[in-house]
Amino acid sequence: MPIKNNSKNEKKIYFVIGLGRSGFWAAKYLRSLGKKVIVWESNENEELSETKEILEKLDISVCLNKQFLFEEFSECLNQIEAVVISPAIPIDHKTIIKLKEKGIEVLGEVNIAWESLKNINWIGITGTNGKTTVTHLLSHILRTNNLLAPFAGNIGTPLCKIAYSIKSKNIDWLVAELSSYQIEIATLCIKPKIGIWTTFTADHLDRHKTLDNYFKIKNSLLKQSEFRIYNYDDIHLRENFKSLSKGIWITTSSKQSDLDHCDYWINNEDFIVERQENLLSLKNFKLKGNHNTQNLLLAIAAARKIGLSPEKIKNALLSYEQLPHRMETIYQSNKLEIINDSKATNFDSSTAGIKAIKGAPIIISGGKLKSGSYIEWVNIINKKAKAVFLFGESSQTLKKLILEGGFKKDIFIFNDLSEVINYVYSYIENNQIETLLFSPSCSSFDQFRNYEERGDIFKKLIHEKFNLKLFAHKEFS
């Protein structure tokens, strides 16, 4: 969608719905292009009021506590250039349907950014789990090799902030993490140079209704990409091998039947192999878990496609620091390791994390339950966990699932994370525990704003109760 220049006879107003990070930067970027911008936000609080003041100084009108209702547009329909919606608003929202019926264009922040950034080489990364790690890892590899390769999108920096900030800079690669919510609204717009699909499992079905719809949305990004990289270890992607657009495939499997379909794999000597040639030794890298080996292979495959040598990739990876809240070791001694995996927001990501642990951990889980199969999660709990501590909205449901799976060891229920940590402290003192794993397996929205806040609070509680000096990304007072 070209962003039109204003004239007397053209519609003038861009309505931005939602004042989160993407809405803020969409409004700011559009205003920098000389557009008239009005922002609507359904909530109202001190933080939003401060954001409103910032935008109003730029001559952007901001309305807080304003609901996204079609009737609110009735007096200005003829003045609307486009409505830019938050990723949180589904495209089948009744107001969106009515706006489209009136011929009004409905866009996402990604659409707006694409128009200014489409001449840059994009790497579009999507997947149910793993996309943030691959995005961060690949950007690190490229930036360490003196390529200007910011990461943005669903992680960290909104794409419109990149568009706003880089007018005089020459970006080599834009590494964009793209969620299904973002792809859904911009599906025919974004055309990456390289598309990467990390994993696919049941998630966000409250939004996308069916697994097939969710799959098609993810796949649309890969269809639009010039080159594609897939994870053969993922059962859904593997089962669709023949129907998916041609691309590069990676696997951690050692089965010859799998290797026949793949370009990158791990051999018996722990070497990363690229089409029959040893590329790098896996022993150089410290990411925990098979799922992170998959992430590593996806990033390496992309870096090789871009043209980086194995030596340059190796040197970059040696300086890589893992993102917080993803199998993050926050404390380790010769007796105890404490791991924060707050990003494990569904059964599949939690299962992958538990599998990565050696020995029998005690596990803390709980939060707001999401859709998806729990069978493998229950099985790995039953096989490996020494004890389970549950909290939050889903605690009773999770306990029922675990007990039905045959779990015979200790299982406890608490109201919140603070209560859990208080009890876990004494439990560890009285039992031989080598690993404490915080692996919620649920979203955070019953008690926290997001998984980052949940992970930070977990670290803070551990720090205070255990009186430990943590390997933390932030200091706690």
Curated annotation (Swiss-Prot):
Its main location: cytoplasm. Gene3D superfamilies: Mur ligase, C-terminal domain (3.90.190.20), Mur-like, catalytic domain (3.40.1190.10), NAD(P)-binding Rossmann-like Domain (3.40.50.720). One of its GO terms (molecular function) is ATP binding. It is found in: Cytoplasm. Pathway: Cell wall biogenesis; peptidoglycan biosynthesis. Coiled coil: none annotated. It catalyses: UDP-N-acetyl-alpha-D-muramoyl-L-alanine + D-glutamate + ATP = UDP-N-acetyl-alpha-D-muramoyl-L-alanyl-D-glutamate + ADP + phosphate + H(+). Its EC number is 6.3.2.9. Pfam families: Mur_ligase_C (PF02875), Mur_ligase_M (PF08245), MurD-like_N (PF21799). Keywords: ATP-binding, Cell cycle, Cell division, Cell shape, Cell wall biogenesis/degradation, Cytoplasm, Ligase, Nucleotide-binding, Peptidoglycan synthesis. ATP binds at G127, T128, N129, G130, K131, T132, T133. InterPro entries: Mur-like_cat_sf, Mur_ligase_C, Mur_ligase_C_dom_sf, Mur_ligase_cen, MurD. It comes from the Bacteria. One of its GO terms (biological process) is cell division. GO terms for cellular component: cytoplasm. Belongs to the MurCDEF family. Cell wall formation. Catalyzes the addition of glutamate to the nucleotide precursor UDP-N-acetylmuramoyl-L-alanine (UMA). This is UDP-N-acetylmuramoylalanine--D-glutamate ligase. It comes from Prochlorococcus marinus (strain MIT 9515).
